[in-house]
Structure formats: C-alpha cells, structure tokens
Amino acid sequence: SSAARAVTGVDIHPEARIGRRVFIDHATGVVIGQTAEVGNDVVIFHGVTLGGVAMTPGKRHPTVGDHVMIGAGAKVLGPITVGTGVKIGANAVVVKDVPCGNVAIGVPARLLPKPEKDTRDRDLIVDPNYFFDEPALYI
C-alpha cells in the first residue's frame, strides 16, 4: 500500500508471492512486482527491482528460487527464473534465466564459472560469511 511504502521505502505488490525467511536488508528502494515469486531463505539488498518488461496479461515478473542473494541495486526483469543458490551481484541487470548455483554479474548480467563451494549446508544462511566470499559481486 502507499502508506507502507511511505514508511518503509519498499514497494511489494500485494499479489507477489514471498517465501519464508526472506530478508530485505536496508530495504529502501526495493520493488517487487505483481507476478513475482520469491522463494525461501532469500536475501535482497537495497535498491533491488524484481520487475516486468511488458504490461501483457499473465506472468510478467521473475521467479526467484530458494537460497538466493540479490545484491544492492540489481534489476531482475521479465518472466525469467533465477534458480536455487544463485548469487546476483550489485547493480547487475538480469534479463535471462540464471541456472541453479550460478553467480550473475554485470550489465547485462553474465554468468561466472560455478564457485567451488560445498552446497550441502545451504540452510546455514545465518553464517555472516555465507554470501560474502565472491569478490566479483562487489565490483
């Protein structure tokens, strides 16, 4: 609602589907569109847009899987899928699907080689170093 946006600086459409334990850090400027779907244990930093690219009926916004990190200022646009365990770098513009476990950076976003990381402990999202081991995310 307009009142919530004025207080929080966040614009989440009431029809967007948001999973459990989604953490929106420094939430100012976050926009989540009407048909967006956000999975469980997702971290979204300030200035992120999960937006549409058309006004056509039906699915227009991204689907974000579980255990995803979306860096500050990133734009994820259109009816695309961001797979489980993906990391999206700050200010990246993502307009194509990102397969599970990949890192996407840049404008337009490109995939980095898969990190050599043990993915069995994805539920340990409370570890403060979980997301901050990819220097390219902050360039």
Question: Where do the language-model regions lie?
Answer:
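C-terminal segments of enzyme domains that contribute to small-molecule binding surfaces
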Residues: 58-77, 81, 107-139
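A transmembrane-helix-recognition feature enriched in membrane-embedded lipid enzymes
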Residues: 1-7
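Left-handed beta-helix
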Residues: 8, 13-14, 19-20, 25-34, ...
